[in-house]
Amino acid sequence: MSQSLKTHRPVPNWPGFRGTSQFVGATPDGIVTVYVDPKLGPPGLANAQELLADALRVVAANNAIFGTTGGAVNIIVYALGGATDGTGGADHAACNYQTGNNIEVCAAFGSPARVSALFEAELSECSMNEQLCGLSTGEALSRWCASSTSNNALADFATAPDWAQNGEPDFVTKVDPTDQNPVSTGCGMAFISWLLSKGHTLAQIAQQMVTDGDAGTFATLYGALTGDNPANAWPEFSNDVTALPGGVNSDNPFG
């Protein structure tokens, strides 16, 4: 007697989503499993399928940035905040692969690169391994990781101009204990752009920031990467910002 068996797949405990989780597929190695809110219809399903197809590229890029091998993650594509253009952002519960591996990303109909970028933003935070979480430093690093793996698909999320328009306050020698302030995040975005323009790689920056941990500032990062006195970071950066011919009008003003 034969009987067809349907494998039961437990629904992940999403941080915010409470609707139906439609299974879309998993990568061959089982590292990434993708779901979608069926209410999104064909455009949402297309987003999820395109994310699944791109997932291993994103994971490989993220692993290279942090010099580590990440863990398995679940992702659901849905309309965060009711948005279907990616502007709802992304979310997860923690900056690790144990309790933060259920990731929510906003649908972006017709713009798969935006969905992949949102995935990387959260995946990078998992790779920070409980460091930099909820801080301006970690938020800037997360956004740079997303930008670097998606050809800046989230350009409209730029915060460095907010920093410039608010008097360019110093968040190089101090850390803002929030990831919700566009001014402090923007300072970090511009500072990382500056370090990249000096020849340092995003991998060097990311790995040193994780090593420095929550107490690390961008000034201490500068000191570790250059061998120079960390006290020189802010004045040198500030002088170079002042000398920018076009000012700060993107997250990569030195690029």
Q: What are these model-predicted stretches?
A:
Residues A64, T69-A72, S150-A158, L196-Q204:
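Structural helix-adjacent loops and short alpha-helical linkers that scaffold large soluble proteins
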Residues V172-P182, S193, A206-Q208, Y222:
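Active-site rim elements
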Residues A55, L135-G138, S184-G188, D214, ...:
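Active-site-proximal structural scaffolding
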Residues Q131-P182:
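Post-HExxH zinc-binding segment in Zn-dependent metallohydrolases
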Residues S184-T217:
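Contiguous mid-protein beta-loop-alpha structural module that forms a pocket-lining wall or clamp
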Residues A83-G89, T149-A155, A215-A219:
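Secretory-pathway/luminal and periplasmic proteins that interact with or process carbohydrate-rich
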Residues M1-L123, S127-G134, G138, C145, ...:
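Zn2+-dependent metallopeptidase catalytic core
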Residues D214-G255:
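Beta/coil-rich, acidic/histidine-enriched accessory regions frequently appended to metallopeptidases
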